[in-house]
Amino acid sequence: MEVAMTDLFTYIKDKNIAIDLNSKWFQELWYPLSKKTGSIITTRLLEWMGYSGEYKLQRQNFKRLLDNNNIPYEEIYHNDDRFLEHPSMIYEIEQTDKKQIKQKRWITLEMRNFKKAILRLNTKNAEVIRDYYLNLEEACFDYAEYQVNWLRKKSDLERSINEDKLNQSMLLLAIKDEELESEKEKGIQTRSMLKKVEEEKIKIENEKEKALRKMLRLKEITITQKERTITQLIYISTSVSYAAQHRFKVGGVEGRRRLRGRLSDYNGRSASGDEWYFCHLIDVADFRKAEGRIEDIIGKFRDKKDKEIYIMPYRKLLKVIELICQNYTIEVSTLNAMLKDIVDEFEDDAVPLIPDAIPQSTFKITRVEFGKNVDTTIIQGKATKAQLIKEFEKYIQTLSVDENEINRKELFDDLSRLYNFNRNDAWVWLKEFIESQEEKTFILKYR
C-alpha cells in the first residue's frame, strides 16, 4: 500500500490523461470543480473557449450564447463578497486598470451551468474545448474512485493490525488464566486477583467488540461516501416530417459518445431526405430511471403502434421532460449534499433514534407455541390531541359543500379502527375544533 494518498496532479500525470496541467487556464477550470463553487468567466477563459477580440466583445458574444440557450448566469463587480478569495478574481483585479476596475463586470455561472455552456459552444475549436473539459471532469471522477479504494485498503490494513493486537492481548490473557489456575492449585491466589483478571477479560472483550464495530462502520462509510454522478443523457429526437405531426422519440444513453450510434440506427430506417436529428439533450444520473419516470407521467401520449414515439406538441413535451429530469437531478444532488452528514452520523457513537409508534387501537397477534395457536392482545398508547385534530381536518374535507352535519358516533367509530383514544376527551377536542372553523358552520350530532 502507498505511504500517502497521491494528489490529483500526480495522479493525472501517472495515468497519462490528456490534460495540460501547466496551461494558464487549467487552474480556472480546476478550482470550481474541486471547490464546488461558481466559475468566473475571465479573459483567459474566454480566449480558451475560442472568443477573439477585446474583452467587451468576447463577453458580449458569450452572453449571447447563454441567452440563446436559456442558461442562467449572473454579472458581478470586483468587490463581490462571494469571490474576494477566488484566485481567478484576484488575478483579474491585478490585470485590470485601476481606473476601469469599478465599471468592469464579470459573468459568473454555477458549475452545472458552466458545463452546459461548454457543451453548447459554437466557436471554431468548440469540439477540442468540450473534449478537454470532459477529460478533466472524468479525471476528477476517476480520482474520487481512487480515493475511495485507497481509504478502503487503509481501513482493511488498520483492521488487520488491530486484530493482531487484540489476539496478542487474548494470548496474554490465556497465559494469565493458566498462571491463575496454577496459583489456585497451590492455594495462594486471592479473590481480589480473580476479580481483577475477570474485569480485565471483560474490558478486552468490550474493546474488541467496540473496535470491530468501528472498523465495520468505517469500511461501510468508505463504500457509501462516493457521490452519484450526473453524466448520462435523456434526448428528444425527431425528423421534419415527424415533428410536423407532433411525433417525437424520447430516449436515453449512458454518455454523449453513444449519441452518434443512436442516430445511425434511426437514420438507417428513415426515408431519404427526412433524416432524424437530436433537438434537445438533458443530463441525468441514470437515463433508464429517467425514462421510467417519463413513461409513468406521460405514457398515455405514446403512439399505440410505435411505443417509442410520444405524440405531443414540442413546446409542451419539452416543458414536461425538463420538469421531470430537473426534479430527478435535484433529488440526486440533494442526496449528494447530504452524504457527509449521513456518514458522520454513522461514525458517531451516539445512541440511535428509535421513533415512536403511532398510537392505534388494540390488535391481536397469533403465535405458534408448542404446536398451538396463542393469541396475544396488544394495546397501543393513546392518540394525542394533535393527531385527532389532524383527522378531524381530513374528515371535514371529505364533506360536500352542502353537508354540514357531523355525527359524533360515526366519526369516533371510524377513528377507533386506527387509534386508541378516550371518547370524552375527543368530544371536547371536536367541539373546540368545530368552533374554530370560520369558513363554514357545522352542526354536531351526538348520535
UniProtKB/Swiss-Prot annotation:
Residues 188-221 form a coiled coil. The keyword Coiled coil applies. Keywords: Coiled coil. It holds the Pfam family T5orf172. Signal peptide: none annotated. This is Putative MSV199 domain-containing protein 420R. The lineage of its organism: Viruses, Varidnaviria, Bamfordvirae, Nucleocytoviricota, Megaviricetes.
